[in-house]
Amino acid sequence: MLEGFDPTTIQDVESARQCVVRLLNLIEALQADNQALRETNQRLQDEINRLKGTPPRPAVKANAPSPDPATRNDYSSEKERQKPKAWNKSSKLDQIRIDREETLRVDPAGLPGDVQFKGYEEVVVQDIILRTDNVRFRKEKYYSASEQKTYLASLPRGYEGEFGPGLKALVIAWHFGANMTEPKILDQLRDVGIRISDGQLSRWLIRDQERFHGEKSARYEAGLRSSPWQQIDDTATWEKGQNRRCHAVCHPLYTAYFTTATKERLAVLDVLQDFRARRYRLNAEAFGFLEMFGVSWRVVNALKQLPPETGLSEGEFLRLLNEHLPQLGPQQKSRVLESAAVAAYHAQREWPVVRLLVGDDAPQWKCLTAELALCWIHEGRHYKKLMPYVAHHVQLLESFLDRYWAYYDQLLSYRERPTPEEKARLEKAFDTLFATVTSYEALDERIAKTRAKKESLLMVLEHPEIPLHNNRSELDARRIVRQRDVSFGTRSAEGTRARDTFLTLVATAKKLGVSFYQYVYDRISGAHQMPSLADLIREKANELNLGASWQPP
């Protein structure tokens, strides 16, 4: 192929330069294919070893990150984004509650005769007491011969079942707040003298939690009503060994967890409505979705014969579809259901409608709200996943990422002091940055994809109160991952619901600065001296004004 080729005869330098660029990109493509084939080969080898019964390849983690980009799997951008912060150590004495005071005296036998008393020097020492508080209640008992009835004094609230509210609240706090497993909790309780069965402990964590389920719904509704925007993310979990998706919906004052069988758009819609019964409506918005989804005109014309602008239950809508569109395929049927359900969600007034979601670019978030804001950090991970092999391409990628995060910093500054002039400048700067063309084809393709997301990435220019990233909900989703690692999933739908409810309480209490243990104890004991978290969300939301940009001028 190269017989007779003499590089010294090259006259057209520009064409030669273009040829070199193409060859370098070909090297990148071949390197990527080679790495993919290596990974596939290793997976197949591992499967062969498993079938043969031989030990699998040990998963040995390196002590230091690999310098080879092809084997790197850390896509974090924290180093690029991190800014040094001034560290000031503050006193914590004013935050410590003093439970008792003890005066320590000097042994007079060791003092000289000329000493003078100069007062006291105070030292605060924190400690904890972990011991039993077993009580023998002597309940008064009366008998009425005339009524043939016995009158017996009642146990205090929270002491039902021969265990007190302090113990019940501590078990819930250990399991859901500290991620302790049930066997470890049993070991700890038995070590301090509590006699309790495995089944009793499990029932405390799962059964008869209706009061907490009700409070969760109230907190969620308060969170949705307190802000027109919400953040969302999901993660994998298990129930009875079956795959499930757990969704985390949040903003700065609360977090709510919901588990569904799938992560499709209708499942997310159920989450946004707190699993209220689905309704369906065929209106202009629904037909707009159908057109966007590319549903055939024959299906659309048939749907236009159904009752318009009418809220239908799921049973009613499915019956109409079966009557008028019996041959409707599964994919088009799914699009029809999604379009009508989302339109009904937007049209109803009984439940708060989310106007903007902050999330990643997963397809299930789209069309659920009027606006969608994308996470800049998630978008940046796409660039971190590029694995250039050629040194020049590495330099091009690093140079572009420096500009990317510099622009991100400018957006952060805009959030603090938004002005129309800065908004216009940042819009132009976005166009300039993402019009960049390099000689690295994979990078150019990635830049073009980011440019296509301009509206969602620059949503912060319209609504400066929303975050530029989705880290808050991603961290909330990790709480489920940590719980999953401890318990390996739940074993019943009741257990899943209890986990979602109490993790909602854990995360929300932390955001509001409320003690999770004290709150659970307050509710179990029946004291109800602490305000509901829903009330706190409403109160603090008024102070933060989370929807300022949606309010009329």
Please annotate each region the language model reported.
Residues 177-188:
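Short, charged amphipathic recognition helices of the HTH superfamily
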Residues 165-178:
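Short, amphipathic alpha-helical "recognition" segments used to contact nucleic acids or chromatin
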Residues 23, 30, 44, 51, ...:
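Mobile genetic element proteins and their domesticated derivatives, centered on retroelements
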Residues 119, 152-154, 239-241, 248, ...:
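Short helix/loop capping segments that flank catalytic or ligand/cofactor-binding pockets
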Residues 356-357, 361-364, 368-400:
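Conserved beta-strand -> loop -> alpha-helix junction used to position metal-binding or nucleic-acid-contacting
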Residues 191-194, 198, 203-359, 363, ...:
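RNase H-like nuclease fold core
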Residues 305-333, 349-367, 398-553:
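Acidic/histidine-rich catalytic cores and adjacent linkers
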Residues 1-161, 202, 232, 277-339, ...:
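Short, flexible loop/hinge motifs at secondary-structure junctions
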